[in-house]
Amino acid sequence: MTNYLVAMEAAWLVRDVNDIDDAIGVAVSEAGKRLNDRDKEYVEVEVGATPCPACGEPFDSAFIAADTALVGLLLEITVFNADGEKHASRIAKSEVGGALRDVPLSVIDCVETEDDDT
């Protein structure tokens, strides 16, 4: 059994906002609150990055139209004692998805980590 760091992307809607920074703050705060309410403090939440199609430089994954923002969040969780990457991904989606109901989640990376007790 191996430990994995699983990174997921979540699409978070924020209504009634006019500023990208406000939308990002609200999205990260709301996601963190919902995770903490379900005792999932170990899930890291931050704004995702999208590469610029012209220059390739990353920028914050957030878009506002009609006072509604779509914010891409990056969620990271360490999964212990998984049978493989697919198993770790399923565990991560189940853990996080249970706390963030009705929020689209997609696994974007799954990396094997070192055991701490070796």
Curated annotation (Swiss-Prot):
Pfam families: DUF555. It comes from the Archaea. Transmembrane segments: none annotated. InterPro entries: UPF0212. Belongs to the UPF0212 family. This is UPF0212 protein HQ_2663A. It comes from Haloquadratum walsbyi (strain DSM 16790 / HBSQ001). The lineage of its organism: Archaea, Methanobacteriati, Methanobacteriota, Stenosarchaea group, Halobacteria.
